[in-house]
Amino acid sequence: MRVLHLLLFMLVGCGAARVRRSRERDWAHHGASMFADLSVRELKAVRDYLHKLPELGLTDARSMPLTKNSILLIELHLPRKHDALKALDRGQAKPPREARVVVQFGNQAQPNVTEYVVSALPFPHSHRVKTFKRNKSIPFESRPMTFVEYNHMRRILEKITTQARTLLFETSGGFSFTNCTDRCLTFTDIAPRGLNVGERRSWVMLQKNVEGYFMHPIGFEVLVNHKDLDSEKWFVEKVWYNDQYFDSMEELVRKYEDGELVKVQLPEHDEEDLFSTYIPRGKSNSASDIHGPKFVQPQGPRYHVDGNFIEYSGWSFAYRVRSSAGLQIFDLRFNGERIAYEVGLQEAIAFYSGDTPAAMQTKFIDSGWAMGTSTFELAPGIDCPEIATFVDLYHYYDTDKPVHYKNALCIFELNTGIPLRRHFNTNNMGGYNFYGGLENNVLVLRATSTVYNYDYIWDFIFYQNGVMESKVSATGYIHATFLTPNGLNYGTKVYNHVLGNLHTHLIHYKVDFDISGRENSFESIDLKYVNFTNPWSPNDYIVQSKLHRTQHATERSAAFRFGKKMPRYFHFYNANEKNKWGHHKGYRIQLNSHAHSVLPRGVKEEKGVTWSRYPLAVTRHKDSETSSTSMYNQNDPWDPVVSFEDYIRDNENLENQDLVAWVTVGFLHVPHSEDIPNTATPGNSVGFFLRPFNFFDEDPSLASKSTVIVRQDKAGNPVVQRWTPARVGHCVSDQPFSYNGTYALV
């Protein structure tokens, strides 16, 4: 009975801690909902409203014809910043909630894509066309691939592979695309889809459909022209087999049968060969019957979540996961003072090199694959600690109903295992004057995107000293192609007949600073050597570094190019606000990146990613410049709907203005044998820090009660001074691991 009473006491104590709420701020709760993703109810209301409009002639997105008008995407349309700030800062009425809707008009003489803004939610009654800079229209060929188009692609591949069934069977060691059981072939399609504006033709490569099929190319690639909306008119333009090009399937098959080409025959498939799987193998010196360390919250979480609003250790912000791109935060404040209006992911690209046509064509622009919707379930204890708060997400993309993604975002507090601050002050006599330290606990907001082969882990990390870190970690499978004699110029052999292709990852972020208000300025700070006579030894001289500040008054001067010397500090500040010591209140951006440009300026495809020219560019805020890219740039990079270069071309003044920093981070990845079965996160994480630079009068983490100070009394005994309970609670979860992994229509 004593044990039962003890368990009940522990459960009650832990439960009470979990429901403990931090103090609420009316302004924050008033405004957070403006940035919340659309609810299932709102998504369905927008869909139903548009489907009832006879002039649009909408049909189901999943109906098989390509000649149809259908909804591709529904997501939140953000309010104008000025209107949002009136609600946040003045307590005025919130602007109406609106939806951004992408409609594909395939059932008309001149097919196109049109975007609408639908208002007001949850009871929509009006809509307007959403326009882009230069009134740029959206070509139909630039639309993303859909479930239906992939079904048609599979059908033409069935015809193609039936023609070459013997070739493929003999080449792959007993695999086929049709009439197969456990030895089937699958395919990967490549983008951009063509070489010029208006094209829609894709290189497709075949792989063995086994676990980790990305690592199993068979040496067959085909160029399919699928521009026509009648899939019966799709056709093969080119075929590549074992480093040889052919103009048609008929030519390939004839030359194969006549022995007029160089054949390749992969070894018989070994079911026991686990190289592309996660199944453990090899020798481990770690005990397999003992679990590793686990996280615990002795008195429950110390952060507060209310819908899409989060508070933690002085921080407060709202968040959303944009279906078209991914994680964003809004109204970022510390102790109630705004630092940024928006910090959000814009784009992720991976540009490859290779010797096969698919490899040399691969320039993935991930918003074109609806990167934000690839938010699948997170595994407790692996993707996030078991103690995390898990949040479900809902997306409406290439569907006829909202799709529910269970546990797709997580929030947790983490001890980093390294002090935030510490000092041991020795007395040089075998003792000490004092020891002081503060544990480094942070809040992590995390989501992932699995864009086909790659998995991106997106983190926003909030420190107690007013620092925010934005980090992306890359994992998942490498994009592999068939190894050719010339292939090692473009990567590394990672298995028999398999080349891991070199590629560059670049990630783009938007940081809309509002440092103590909207009127901000930007300067860079570097060092210059100075040489002067030593004032206390006139026959000698002093050489040392001196601060050198450069005020960037225009957008062009604040656009820093890759390949140029970079200043050490990027400082954003409010010239009208000072801290206690007379310094302008500011924050700086510190890059953690190994990025470089992916293509020379002037290359056709580079036009679609002009933001990739700059590790940092600063512009004036405009509501018309909400994002640096678009989901259409993937399939039409040659004349993109959104070109970031347009944002800085007008070269506007930046002094005492509402400033937006556009940050590019990334790294080169030359695959290596340790990328098998897939890429690990260590060394593959990049990002940036937002660090206070005279924003506070002192380190704000001094407010933390987790500080520990130890001094010696006169007898030499340690005297511990702390402001938290000396004993930690016992709320340790004993729940077994569970994982569902499914997502479903709702």
Which residues fall in each region the model found?
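Cleavable N-terminal signal peptides of Sec/SRP-targeted secreted and luminal proteins
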Residues: 2-17
